[in-house]
Amino acid sequence: MDICSRNKKLTIRRPAILVALALLLCSCKSTPPESMVTPPAGSKPPATTQQSSQPMRGIWLATVSRLDWPPVSSVNISNPTSRARVQQQAMIDKLDHLQRLGINTVFFQVKPDGTALWPSKILPWSDLMTGKIGENPGYDPLQFMLDEAHKRGMKVHAWFNPYRVSVNTKPGTIRELNSTLSQQPASVYVQHRDWIRTSGDRFVLDPGIPEVQDWITSIVAEVVSRYPVDGVQFDDYFYTESPGSRLNDNETYRKYGGAFASKADWRRNNTQQLIAKVSHTIKSIKPGVEFGVSPAGVWRNRSHDPLGSDTRGAAAYDESYADTRRWVEQGLLDYIAPQIYWPFSRSAARYDVLAKWWADVVKPTRTRLYIGIAFYKVGEPSKIEPDWMINGGVPELKKQLDLNDAVPEISGTILFREDYLNKPQTQQAVSYLQSRWGS
């Protein structure tokens, strides 16, 4: 999920386990023993969680670059108590608004990069609350969100960006990351410099290093074991490259990829291994916690694969090396939430074509299907997608929600993203949502 800008382009309780986790989370080391997070070969995850009878009416709440929260101005408040109060009140106001709209689930970004929005023993504090990496904001944002959302009868899924370490590679960012060397815990950037690569003009972890997979899994385990989250979600950031900033993993491929026919197959196996490890780990700790992924809307185009959709878009399988269809078929996910960010009239990637394609994928499985829709496009002028401008985008939004309600395999909708509920150009659509979903 390209959360930094979200201008998506078409080229688009088992006691033994808990004891082990307690030892892991009390340790200062950032790399857990492999046995703690790696399932036995050939094992399958336990049965998925039971589906709620209530349809998903979700919202993504992004914290990266303070897109939705915390308020940008709050970071300039010098008094920590006053700053925390302002941030907490902003969260309360947002949740009150979401409750009025009928939103029942918040996908809260707790790991936007290589930092955390909870007091982690593995990651340093995020700079998003204070302006400085590693600085304690004086409260626990994840716990505060959980308390306030659950008080309102809303669920919270902890949203992780698994591989991203930073949102840019500027000298100032490097200085900030290096400054954590004297902290506990320090950034993975300084603890494991050999894991770090540059890709898409960001510092990222190399997905092909087995220790990286285990390290990411340990972070998820920390949250699931310590907090009453209702779910865990990974966004669509797997292998994320740009034409001018490709990920150089040639050495990693030479070391670990000998058994694969191609580098692309090896990369897809790496993301597959991470998803499998995280899925098994979550179910071993708390079987009731849901695990899902929100990938790009196109798995593969039919022109490249007869099993693909009748589309011409950037495919997760080929671009991000994420075989999301396979993850569904193997039962690794409780839900999948493809980002179908195009209108019915976009011939290269029609909303209805993709939604029905995904419905067919999940039909023989136990994986639930939620559709991520592009609320950020509502009311925005577009020559390519003019439907978002017609009558404030309400007719297009209504068609998408109607389809989601009509197809039995679709269990709900997630809107991208929260701050767009407050934009002047979306207010007709917000009023429509309240009349449709609100109490």
Swiss-Prot record:
Keywords: Cell outer membrane, Cell wall biogenesis/degradation, Glycosidase, Hydrolase, Lipoprotein, Membrane, Palmitate, Signal. Residues 1-27 form the signal peptide. InterPro entries: Divisome_Glycosyl_Hydrolase, GHL10, Glycoside_hydrolase_SF. Gene3D superfamilies: Glycosidases. A lipid is attached at C28 (S-diacylglycerol cysteine). CDD domains: AmyAc_family. Its main location: membrane. It comes from the Bacteria. The keyword Ribonucleoprotein does not apply. Residues 34-54 are annotated as: Disordered. Divisome-localized glycosyl hydrolase that cleaves peptide-free (denuded) peptidoglycans. Has either glucosaminidase or muramidase activity. PANTHER family: GLYCOSYL HYDROLASE DIGH. This is Glycosyl hydrolase DigH. It comes from Escherichia coli (strain K12).
